[in-house]
């Protein structure tokens, strides 16, 4: 019964990606980007808005705000079951 630690960042981004939930991403310079998360890795997030994709480096991101609340408990349990 060895539980792996929950990676909250990956769980959150994966959930908004799977649900096609619109997000607003606030950058450290105050600029905001709106769109859908299409993918992410350790260093970047790819978002799409009006048919255009942008790759944003995570170190430039201040906040990611989804349109609706995310159920992180259910998402992390589903993620653990996939492992």
From Swiss-Prot:
GO molecular function: RNA binding
InterPro entries reported in the protein's UniProt record: Hfq, LSM_dom_sf, Sm
Lineage, broadest ranks: Bacteria, Bacillati, Bacillota, Clostridia, Eubacteriales
Positions of the Sm domain: 10-70
Entry GO terms, CC: cytosol
Family annotation (Gene3D superfamilies): 2.30.30.100
GO biological process: regulation of DNA-templated transcription; regulation of RNA stability; regulation of translation, ncRNA-mediated
Protein name: RNA-binding protein Hfq
Family to which the UniProt record says this protein belongs: Belongs to the Hfq family.
């Amino acid at each position: 019964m060895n539980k792996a630690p929950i990676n909250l960042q990956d769980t959150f981004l994966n959930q908004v990606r799977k649900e096609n939930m619109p997000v607003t991403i606030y950058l450290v310079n105050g600029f905001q980007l709106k769109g859908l998360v299409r993918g992410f890795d350790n260093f970047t997030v790819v978002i799409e808005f009006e048919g255009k994709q942008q790759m944003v480096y995570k170190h430039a991101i201040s906040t990611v705000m989804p349109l609706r609340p995310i159920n992180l408990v259910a998402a992390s349990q589903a993620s653990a079951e996939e492992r």
